[in-house]
Amino acid sequence: MATITGSSMPTRTACFNYQGRSAESKLNLPQIHFNNNQAFPVLGLRSLNKLHVRTARATSGSSDTSEKSLGKIVCGMSLVFVGAEVGPWSKTGGLGDVLGGLPPVLAGNGHRVMTVSPRYDQYKDAWDTNVLVEVKVGDKIETVRFFHCYKRGVDRVFVDHPLFLERVWGKTGSKLYGPKTGIDYRDNQLRFSLLCQAALEAPRVLNLNSSKYFSGPYGEDVIFVANDWHSALIPCYLKSMYKSRGLYKNAKVAFCIHNIAYQGRNAFSDFSLLNLPDEFRSSFDFIDGYNKPCEGKKINWMKAGILESDQVFTVSPHYAKELISGEDRGVELDNIIRSTGIIGIVNGMDNREWSPQTDRYIDVHYNETTVTEAKPLLKGTLQAEIGLPVDSSIPLIGFIGRLEEQKGSDILVEAIAKFADENVQIVVLGTGKKIMEKQIEVLEEKYPGKAIGITKFNSPLAHKIIAGADFIVIPSRFEPCGLVQLHAMPYGTVPIVSSTGGLVDTVKEGYTGFHAGPFDVECEDVDPDDVDKLAATVKRALKTYGTQAMKQIILNCMAQNFSWKKPAKLWEKALLNLEVTGNVAGIDGDEIAPLAKENVATP
């Protein structure tokens, strides 16, 4: 167990229920707007001004969530989310989005919520707590320091250590796990062992008083929510270092699988690095048919996290079904997950950042009453910016995503050849594996005036594609939940998707999008059948362009609600079933300080 070496010791803890009574927690203390500088290639300012007026009238009766009362605060659950990413401070995919978006909504419902993640950069809004703890990592004793900020009702805790900061400083966006895509740091096991141990100390040693409703340490009656293999040691250390000594007696662990493809498989001999008793070895034991990272017997962090936790979650109901359907989609952990059971809850999204009514990156703000006027404007601006012929009558397809096998960009590249002779344009935006970046970079040469590939990702352009495109294509071989389709639909941008994971749960064929069917999950080669299915589905979607059916699909898309409200309630219900002492249901509250400024990492 870690030891405290800092001077800031916890002093008290309190929470308030809706009647204002305090309750003690048991503690075990250790020693449409437009930018003037942007021009429109189609339509004029007169059309734009009319659109602005219509949108303003349509939205004038809506209420601002910031003006709503926060409701009654209850002392619900004490929740500690642990992950290698937390948006917007650190994010490479859906994991960071979940840890950024779900906790504030749970906090708004009356729960006390903390996230613990590495301090990869000099985050300007996080301050040193002056609390240090010592943990054993491998054969060394390491000292870690905690940084903290309180945002949108959540205690954001960052673990400070050279294993994180010196490795990634100034390059957070793509260097969290390795020097380049597909290559891991050799000491990742030590890095994330340190994270897990520090995360277990944080609720006990940090005296946090940012909230007017809660103060002091979180104490020990908490639920840890571990996310992906990087935090899979949480339940193991909890049992071996704490419960065995009478600490964290009532604490429970929920383990969430965001992507089964990344399991933390390592050499069997590396088990000794984890400083766990031999009784845990069987939970890590794993044999597969691959010679990476080594031949023969291995340890598997995710397997252990699944087996040792109290409840297993994943990020959509259909993905949960896929994980137990067989070893191809369960990636050889299907039998394990089938034995433990699993709960699938669709992710929400940040509808503050992704809203056509407030998006800071687009020139025209709009809603369902003005979408048919706004999108041609935005399409024309996008076409001009990326170098495609400006013509609002041509349907425009967008792709946004990592260029790797999972996301199916290689399938898309081959499918373009089969529909490029249609009246269509396509823009592909993403970064990733070099071989796939090269495939994208030659699209303009192969299909002049029809296709553009951009391998320098930037957030403003992603927003402009989401708003300006008519369709968004998501040809994933597998997709646990997916966020691009959630972002696109509120903008009236219609998804064309493969039928896998969360895409099945969120996109309804003929109602809010078009399904191509499931694709082969093997990533070694492109399956010609998948190429044909994708091309046929794109052609089918293009036939609806400009029709009344298409207009209805657009309105259906914009009517969808993908906020975190409903997922948060489902999470709450499932976590309450863990029956941690003192935990009670929350309220149907509003997020605390929903308009807080965006956080920016400052190297």
Curated annotation (Swiss-Prot):
Keyword flag Chloroplast:
yes
**Signal peptide as annotated in the record:** none
Localization (cell): Plastid, Chloroplast; Plastid, Amyloplast
Q: Show the SUPFAM superfamilies listed in the entry.
A: UDP-Glycosyltransferase/glycogen phosphorylase
The family database entries (InterPro entries) matched by this protein are listed as: Glyco_trans_1 (IPR001296), GS/SS (IPR011835), Starch_synth_cat_dom (IPR013534)
Q: Where is the transit peptide?
A: 1-75
Tissue and organ expression note: Expressed in pods and leaves. No expression in flowers or stipules.
**Could you say which residues bind ADP-alpha-D-glucose here?**
K91
Q: Which GO terms describe its cellular component?
A: amyloplast; chloroplast
User: In terms of one coarse class, where is the protein primarily found?
Assistant: plastid
Decide whether keyword Glycosyltransferase is in the record: yes
User: EC no.?
Assistant: 2.4.1.242
What would you give as a GO molecular function for this chain, any one?
alpha-1,4-glucan glucosyltransferase (UDP-glucose donor) activity
Please, one GO biological process term?
starch biosynthetic process
Pathway, per Swiss-Prot/TrEMBL?
Glycan biosynthesis; starch biosynthesis
Write the record's keywords in alphabetical order, separated by commas: Amyloplast, Chloroplast, Glycosyltransferase, Plastid, Starch biosynthesis, Transferase, Transit peptide
Any coiled-coil regions, as ranges: none
Catalyzed reactions: an NDP-alpha-D-glucose + [(1->4)-alpha-D-glucosyl](n) = [(1->4)-alpha-D-glucosyl](n+1) + a ribonucleoside 5'-diphosphate + H(+)
The role this protein plays is: May be responsible for the synthesis of amylose.
Q: Which family does it belong to?
A: Belongs to the glycosyltransferase 1 family. Bacterial/plant glycogen synthase subfamily.
Could you identify this protein by its name?
Granule-bound starch synthase 1, chloroplastic/amyloplastic
